[in-house]
Amino acid sequence: FGTTETTVGRGFMGSLEQPRTVAPNLGLLRTHAGNSVDMQIHPLTRDPRGTVIGSLPKTSSSITDVGADASREHLRIWLEGEHWYAQGLGSTNGTVLESGAGDGDIVIEPPRDQREPGKVYPPVEIENSDRLHLGLYTTFLVIVD
């Protein structure tokens, strides 16, 4: 990756899009060292329960294309209004969002051994061209599907 098509942020997309009242469909593309592992796009459901990503999720809308250090139910992504959100599900190795707009990294949920006792980690909005790092070995590129 690293091409113009895959590194653009919300500023570029905003210049191409007309105002909308419906959130775009998003999908996840698994990557490895910045390159696509396979070209399979995992669509995210618009169902209010969302999509659960992990090694053994219990939901019908799930993504299991993850590395060995992803938890059974690692991350949930859902649509609320016109915005997509991600929230950690108490994973062992945590999740970090790398902003596609160049806004830096946001810790969605730190690894279990670094969490503050009793702290609730709120949902984080995700957008086209963001990257989600689940633990050390699983990265997804967020794309308009």
Task: List each model region and its residues.
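Intrinsically disordered, low-complexity acidic Ser/Thr-rich regulatory segments
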Residues: F1-A68, P117, Y121, E125-R131, ...
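Forkhead-associated
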Residues: S61-S62, H74-R131
